[in-house]
Regions:
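A solvent-exposed, acidic/Ser-Thr-rich amphipathic alpha-helical stretch
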Residues: 68, 79-139, 229-284
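N-terminal export leaders
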Residues: 14-21
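Short, low-complexity N-terminal intrinsically disordered segments enriched in polar/charged residues
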Residues: 22, 41-83, 87, 182-230, ...
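N-terminal secretory signal peptides
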Residues: 1-12, 24-31, 38-40
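N-terminal leader/capping segments at the start of a protein or of a new domain
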Residues: 18, 27, 32, 46-50
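A beta-strand edge to alpha-helix "cap/lid" segment located at domain peripheries
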Residues: 45-57, 116-211, 265-273, 278-340
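Short, solvent-exposed loop/helix junctions and linker helices
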Residues: 11, 60-64, 105, 210, ...
Length: 340
């Protein structure tokens, strides 16, 4: 079964809502009907909602503590409060990189200075809010949206790979689709190629992901590197969903997923011999890995994974910079999703 989707991975499905309600321990579905809380009430027992935004955070594959921590962090960011936002970051080590634009900060003071320059210019109603969180308090994949006006005329729907130590962020790398933001707007903001960071500082935080997440990530990455769609399909649960955000493709079921991965082995930027795992985060049920590619349309990106209790993939979301790919490649990726 194949569905061509809009910006996948940032909505709240009925399945995810019900799962989140079961995991969260509080009445999430009921909480979504409550008036939006003020930012000062963000830590209250009001379910996984977000102040000022009509959204229910999908925390079905995250621990409650990291969901609340991320919500508090982004609520403070949404208040355009540089000092408050920086209380969520470690003094040392700290790394923050935008993997699309190449903007980078490697110490607390420089990041604080940057926020102090950005935030006063944000629109009053601007928000940076989470929609889905995968992982635990050591590391998580955070799907979040920066509304229009924060960093340009369009919204940014990103996946942040975040490492934590003692409830402080030690490393955050943001991946998003430059086509959704606008190809020309993205190009204007991107640093020159010779200035783009080569080291994403994963060595400063180490590999703390759960062993199950590591095992699945490495097996999947190896199958994709070898163009082994059938081997990759074996890692998926019967009702699994595969979604590639820049390609606007969603596929359901291992057989169809395997067929698609076989047919696109030479097209997908995270498939082929030049690909490698950069860093893994998450728990035994939610997380994923950053990847790099020596060749192809995009040189870096992220694979977010939801796993069931047997370690099978129930949902895979791929995020990379589609502005680096030409139209014909994206058309080919869509055509390969047509089943026969």
């Amino acid at each position: 079964m194949v569905r061509i989707s809009k910006q996948a991975g940032n909505g709240m499905t009925r399945r995810g809502l019900l799962q989140g309600a079961a995991v969260g321990g509080v009445g999430i579905a009921g909480a979504s009907l409550l008036p939006a809380p003020t930012a000062s009430a963000v830590g209250a027992s009001n379910g996984f909602v977000f102040p000022g935004v009509d959204v229910v955070i999908d925390g079905s594959h995250a621990t409650t503590d990291v969901t609340l921590l991320v919500r508090e962090y982004l609520a403070r960011k949404s208040e355009a409060d540089p000092d408050g936002t920086m209380t969520f970051f470690s003094r040392n080590p700290v790394t923050y990189i935008d993997a699309v634009l190449g903007w980078s900060w490697y110490d607390w003071d420089s990041l604080r200075t940057a926020l102090g320059q950005f935030m006063p210019n944000w629109p009053k109603e601007g928000k940076s809010y989470p929609t889905r969180i995968l992982g635990n308090s050591t590391g998580a994949m955070v799907f979040f949206t920066d509304t229009a006006g924060l960093f340009g005329s369009s919204e940014i729907r990103a996946v942040g790979v975040i490492n934590f130590s003692d409830r402080r962020i030690t490393r955050q790398i943001d991946y998003w689709d430059g086509r959704h933001f606008g190809i020309s707007d993205t190009a204007k903001l991107r640093v020159p190629t010779d200035k783009f960071p080569a080291d994403f500082r994963e060595s400063t935080v180490g590999e703390t992901a759960a062993q199950t997440m590591k095992n699945v990530s490495y097996k999947l990455a190896r199958a994709l590197r070898n163009g082994d769609g059938a081997g990759a399909a074996d890692l998926f649960a019967p009702g699994a969903v595969f979604e590639d955000v820049p390609a606007h493709v969603q596929i359901v079921g291992p057989r169809s997923i395997g067929s698609y991965l076989t047919g696109t082995a030479s097209l997908l930027p995270y498939s082929g011999q030049g690909t490698a795992v950069r860093h893994i985060v998450g728990s035994a049920t939610g997380g994923g890995y950053e990847w790099t590619a020596a060749d192809g349309s995009a040189s870096r990106g992220v694979i977010a994974l939801e796993l069931d209790s047997w370690g099978k993939i129930t949902r895979l979301t791929a995020m990379w910079d589609g502005s680096q790919a030409d139209d014909s490649m994206l058309v080919s990726l869509s055509q390969k999703a047509i089943e026969r």
